[in-house]
């Protein structure tokens, strides 16, 4: 099995919102803001093939579904569907994808499911041959969002996914589509039912898989958020998220599971370590994956 990091459309969002209650004097060491206080963000997907005999895409980024006014409001930098172009550059088309795994349905993670915006055209799903995996608890949230996060969802998307006949809701550690090859866990600090997907590693120690890769989604958007106290203003429950992040990182450190970041503009994957003060940190950083073996 090989892994690719697949670039999607990029964003610029307010740095204060991305770093919660961390002061600018701290976070600007990690991300340089522009004149409008916005920082650069990637919307990176992970491609794995063959995984359980399938070609699997973990998330789709923000895509190009926004009309021009909303694209500007949310800082989307390109009007074309960059993820589809990046798939092509890696030797794949969106029709080749067998499974799309979605950590959650916020637009910056699921917008790439849709064709680019065009005047007068209704939203249209891409990936016509793929099974779409969504966490069952988060599916309920997407259908009945809270006023605080309603704007983060694409109103038409749940109905389109359901009408496709290829939606699988996941409510445990494994899915029908991917079997034992991918292990799922769930988090509620960012959004209810956030689904974290771990590609199971090649080694087993004391009955536990070692050496895989986990898609961190918005539990840990990039390297700065590996630090336990750092959360986003977008998180619904920062204290819960910190507790979930601690347990998550302790587990991944113990089992040698690498972290894959979706929003870090410079780093696709890293190893979690403890620094000389015992704090979690990212090390052995990898900027891009190009047909990289899982065990490499």
What are these regions (language model features)?
Residues 30-36, 120-121, 184-185:
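Short, P/G- and charge-enriched loop/turn segments at secondary-structure junctions
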Residues 78-92, 96-108, 124-186, 240-256:
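Metallo-beta-lactamase
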Residues 2, 9-90, 196-218:
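Conserved beta-strand hairpin/beta-sheet module of binuclear metal-dependent hydrolase folds
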Residues 8-9, 60-63, 105, 137-138, ...:
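Active-site metal-binding loops of divalent metal-dependent hydrolases
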Residues 110-122, 271-275:
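Metal-dependent catalytic neighborhoods of phosphoester/phosphodiester hydrolases
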Residues 74-85, 202-296:
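Cap/insert and terminal regions of metallo-dependent hydrolase folds
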Residues 56-58, 101, 132, 213-215, ...:
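Residue-level marker for buried hydrophobic side chains located in beta-strands
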